[in-house]
């Protein structure tokens, strides 16, 4: 889901580099193909019967069981612009993200800029219709938010391996001039059934930067992961440093099973974030506590850069299975929510960011 745009000056937009596909597109980026995007009748496979969502949920794109070239689009994933898709010739299942065709250049620009990386998902095929853009991704096996929520946190030995993959993906994006902006646990999904390998789900909401200046002016983030500088009155902020703050929130949540800053009232939540004070849970090793503090620095310039995270001792050592006692976890009131809640802000909260 897209991050909630925060209140900002109307005359200032996100800085993105114009894309010229012929010159800048990566050699391994799927070639854009043009297709008809009107529904085509065709038999539905009996092994994957569609479960159509309510008609009101089908906006803005396509009806369920729509034939699209060699694919059939099945039901829409709740609360997103993604659909289950079946590749008929092979029977392989994919995830298809659908956008207005007018957004094709902006949506594909980050993929054209970014070289292939093992922890960043890449489209397997891109189809452009007269009205809509269809981007197909390999099917994944759940997201990190769901894993942390179900287990109320994960032990350091496991978290270190997963977080190393997350930091590697972000460092790769930053190295090649992408600011991700909407970083959260839900954006990282498992590429294998064993749920040991992570990929950044997509580059939606990423900004393509020009030069070394990563300043952004638009206020764009998720409530639980937003950095204090975005909530301040400063006209601009470092996009890369804001991404690092979000990584710090993610790491804290993975280890503690709760957010470092939480309140049911958004205004109070943002006040806690602005103050930048949080309590680390008991049971964490000294290197883990050190890394969290290096990421959740109130002053953006004092935070580690993404590449520096990979050099931190906590990610370079052998880990014992260190985790907070189960009795402490049951008493925590700031657990990761069962539903979207803070990760997917309602429109009514938008004005509270300013």
UniProtKB/Swiss-Prot annotation:
Keyword set includes Heme: no
Compartment(s) where it occurs, according to its Swiss-Prot or TrEMBL record: Nucleus
The keyword Transcription appears for this protein: yes
Residues spanning the membrane: none
Biological processes, Gene Ontology terms: cellular response to insulin stimulus; intrinsic apoptotic signaling pathway in response to endoplasmic reticulum stress; negative regulation of DNA-templated transcription; negative regulation of fat cell differentiation; negative regulation of fatty acid biosynthetic process; negative regulation of insulin receptor signaling pathway; negative regulation of MAPK cascade; negative regulation of protein kinase activity
Region annotated Disordered, chain positions: 36-61, 320-354
Compositional bias annotation for Acidic residues: 341-354
Bias-annotated ranges (Pro residues): 41-55
Chief location bin: nucleus
Any single GO CC term annotated in Swiss-Prot or TrEMBL for this entry: nucleus
UniProt induction comment: In liver under fasting conditions and by thapsigargin. Expression is activated by ATF4 in response to stress.
Compositional bias annotation for Basic and acidic residues: 320-333
Residue stretches making up the Protein kinase domain: 68-315
An example molecular function term from Gene Ontology annotations: protein kinase binding
Keywords (A to Z) from UniProt: Apoptosis, Nucleus, Protein kinase inhibitor, Transcription, Transcription regulation
Region (Interaction with DDIT3/CHOP): 1-127
Tissues/organs with expression: Highly expressed in liver. Not detected in heart, brain, spleen, lung, skeletal muscle, kidney or testis.
Quaternary structure (record): Interacts with AKT1, AKT2, MAP2K1 and MAP2K7. Interacts with ATF4. Interacts with DDIT3/CHOP and inhibits its interaction with EP300/P300. Interacts with APOBEC3C. Interacts (via N-terminus) with APOBEC3A. Interacts with RELA.
Family: Belongs to the protein kinase superfamily. CAMK Ser/Thr protein kinase family. Tribbles subfamily.
Task performed by this protein: Inactive protein kinase which acts as a regulator of the integrated stress response (ISR), a process for adaptation to various stress. Inhibits the transcriptional activity of DDIT3/CHOP and is involved in DDIT3/CHOP-dependent cell death during ER stress. May play a role in programmed neuronal cell death but does not appear to affect non-neuronal cells. Acts as a negative feedback regulator of the ATF4-dependent transcription during the ISR: while TRIB3 expression is promoted by ATF4, TRIB3 protein interacts with ATF4 and inhibits ATF4 transcription activity.
Protein name: Tribbles homolog 3
Gene source species: Mus musculus (Mouse)
Taxonomic lineage of the native organism: Eukaryota, Metazoa, Chordata, Craniata, Vertebrata
Gene encoding the protein: Trib3
């Amino acid at each position: 889901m897209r991050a909630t745009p925060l209140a900002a000056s109307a005359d200032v937009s996100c800085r993105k580099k114009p894309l010229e596909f012929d010159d800048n597109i990566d050699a391994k980026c799927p070639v854009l193909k043009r297709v008809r995007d009107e529904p085509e009748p065709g038999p539905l496979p009996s092994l994957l019967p569609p479960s159509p969502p309510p008609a009101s949920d089908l906006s803005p794109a396509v009806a369920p069981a729509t034939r699209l070239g060699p694919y059939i689009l099945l039901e829409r994933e709740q609360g997103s612009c993604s659909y289950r898709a079946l590749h008929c010739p092979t029977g392989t299942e994919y995830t298809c993200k659908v956008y207005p065709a007018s957004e094709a250049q902006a949506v594909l620009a980050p993929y054209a800029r970014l070289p292939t990386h093992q922890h960043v998902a890449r489209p397997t095929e891109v189809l452009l219709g007269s009205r809509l853009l269809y981007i197909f991704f390999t099917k994944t096996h759940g997201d990190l938010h769901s894993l942390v929520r179900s287990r109320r946190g994960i032990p350091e030995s496991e978290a270190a391996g997963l977080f190393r993959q997350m930091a590697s993906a972000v460092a790769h994006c930053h190295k090649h001039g992408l600011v991700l902006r909407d970083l959260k646990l839900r954006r990282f999904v498992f590429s294998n059934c064993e749920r040991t390998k992570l990929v950044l789900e997509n580059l939606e909401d990423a900004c393509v930067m020009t030069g070394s200046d990563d300043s952004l002016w638009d206020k764009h983030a998720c409530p639980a992961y937003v950095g204090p500088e975005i909530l301040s009155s400063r006209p601009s902020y470092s996009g890369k440093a804001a991404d690092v703050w979000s990584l710090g929130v993610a790491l804290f949540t993975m280890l503690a099973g709760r957010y470092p800053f939480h309140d049911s009232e958004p205004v109070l939540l943002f006040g806690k974030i602005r103050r930048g004070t949080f309590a680390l849970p008991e049971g964490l090793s000294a290197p883990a506590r050190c890394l969290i503090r290096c990421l959740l620095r109130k002053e953006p310039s004092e935070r580690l850069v993404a590449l520096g995270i990979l050099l931190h001792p906590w990610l370079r050592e052998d880990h014992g299975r260190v985790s907070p006692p189960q009795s402490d976890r049951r008493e925590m009131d700031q657990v990761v929510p069962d539903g979207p809640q803070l990760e997917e802000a309602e429109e009514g909260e938008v004005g509270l960011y300013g």
